Every structure is written in structure tokens, then in C-alpha cells.
Amino acid sequence: MAKAVYVGVGSKARKMKKAYVGIGGKARKVKKMYIGIGGKARLCYSAEADKFGTATPLSKYRIFLAGTTVGGYALFGGGGYDSDARKGEAIMDAYNASLTRTTAASLSVARQGLTAITLGNHALFVGGRSGDTSFGTVDVYDASLTRTTATELSIARCDSAAAVVGSYALFAGGRRNNGLFTMSQSAVDAYNTSLTRTTATPLPSNVYACAGGTVGGYAVFSGGSSMNSDSTLVETIGAMEMVRAYDSSLTSSKAAPLSCPRAVHSAATIGNHLLFAGGYNSTTGKYLSTVESYDASLTRSTAVELSSAKNGLASATVGEYAMFAGGYKGNSDAAYVATVDAYNTALTKTTMPDLSVGRYGLASAVIGDYALFAGGISKIQGPAYKYQDVVDVYSA
């Protein structure tokens, strides 16, 4: 567990976020501090990431939920839990900086496979599906957890990707179910801080299960599956290498492609790097451990690989670490992965203590110094599956 030091400022205790010492005329960052107690060195401060433990479980176990942050809360909304995880839930769980859980106003429409992101003082929960119906619903939560709705997506869909650039939150790709068939989508909807929706240039191909993130002045979307499929997000067909970038004026440009096709991967920004990690390559039929980095000029490089090849992982950036947790790596009792890898601003990888339960289809959100990984599904043994309500907490 990470340790903290507090200093008195204006009669209030303020947490020290960083500490430096002078060495050879240069400021060097302190990673750990110790104090002597009873003749022994005791750790009193750590700037390194670690596992904190678990928080109060979700109010209901579920998979394919969405997580993000607003005000002083980490929010986890929606999800599914029936025999095939297609039926949606409207639950909204909120965790404060003390990791106390409350229940906020429910989503206006019960759904799973939705996408969430924070834009200014609002948390947006967008799209999703329940059964064979897709939704374009946009639920908005403010810092007091009051829920309103914004203009719907231009096309109802689930399994889209999100990223923020400038004053816009972009929602790209996804797939639409209408009860008869499923169609992947290329639409990119942009919402500004006034929650006005505009339509940006579409992606070059119809895709779902792509990944999105922000670096420099760009929102970047990569990969995804081009195949029209109503299958689960375990082994997608038609994965792609495409990478598309949008600047703050919503101008679209092409970036260097991924090194290989991938879908159901995850993205996180750390420092000047946007990382795309894991996924499934339908061309080779292999799960991926590859981590690709895009800098502010959209130059692509590779980082140290994940400790396990997998897709369906969750990601979060907390402190100076981008974390990738959980996932799925094949049809076996050991397919549901518990590993957690953390990358610092130098892209040095640290393997963290495992999740309490290996699982897939989990969601993440950050509150204060904590990254929370919630929900998902695990395989117990043989044909037995278990939907999860566990919330693992990592600190930095």
C-alpha cells in the first residue's frame, strides 16, 4: 500500500504529492522515505504504485459496465448479468475519495456495453444495448451526481470508444443492433462542454471494439473489428490496424497504423505517451501482449509488452502510472487474467500485485490517488462462470 505524508497549510493537512532533494545541484525526486521507530526503518512515504486492497463491492455483480470520474466521485454505471450478459442494468454506483460507496440516480435507460468519459464538470454515459436493442442515450452526471440527458448519438450503438480533445468528448465507432442483424459503425459524435452534439468526420471504416485516448492535441482512435457480428467481445473477427486522430477543431488525420490488427484492446495516457495495449488479432488468431505508444506528434513506438497476452482488459491513469488490469486470454479455466501492469512516464513497466479475481469485461475509474477496477466475469471451473461485484483498488 502506498504511504503518504501530510504538511500543515493554512491550518489544514495537505497531502504531499511529490518530494525532491537536492543532489549535486539538481532536484531529484524522492521515491520512498523511511523513519526510525524502535531501531527499525519504517516506510512513511512512497511515490510508487501499489495495490491498496478492495473497496465495498458494487451494489450488483455485472459485466460490460462503464466507469469514469466526476467531481469527488468514481462512477460505475450500467452493465449486464443475465445468462449471456446482454440484458442491461441501470445501476449507478459512486465511490468517494474515502472509497465509501453510495448509489446515485439510475441511468435513464438500462443497458450494457455503454461508454463513459469525463468532459469538464460532467460525466457522460453514452450508448449501449439491452437484449437486441441498441441505444443512443446520453446520460450526464454533474459533480453533485444530478443526472440529466443530452442529445442522443446520431446513430444508436454499443461498444464504441471515447476520447477528449480540447472542449470536445468524441465517441467513435460501435455496433448497432436492431433485433434482426448487427452493423458496425463509423460515426464519430462530438459533444462540447455545453453538451451540444456535432458530427465529426467518420472513421475510415465501420468498426466496433476500437480504443481511444488523448495525447498532445489529439484524440486518437485505433484498431477495432470491421466485421458485422453479434458475437461477444471475446474473439472478434476482422480486426484492423487503422489509427485516426482528431484535433481540437475536429479535423481528422491519419496516423501511423498499429503494428498489427487488433480489437478489444485498451488505451491509457501517461505523460506524453498514449498507450494501446493488448487485444485480439483475428488474422493470426492470437491474443496480444503488445503495447504501442504514440507521442504528441503521433509518432509510433513500442513499449515493454504486457506480462500476459489478453483482450478485454481495463485501463486507468493514476498519479504517474498507466495501469492495465485483467482480461481474457483463451478458452480455458485459466483464461480470465488477474495481472496488472503499470507504466510510468518513462514507459518502464512494473508488474503489480494481481487483482483479487481474474476477470474480463471489467471497468475502471480514478478517484484521488486511487484507481478502481470493478465488476467483470470470471470462470470458476469447467463450464461455471461467475459475474463479479468486486472492486480492486490500486494507489499511486
Residues of each region from the PLM?
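A short, compositionally biased N-terminal segment around positions ~18-40 that is enriched
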Residues: 23-28
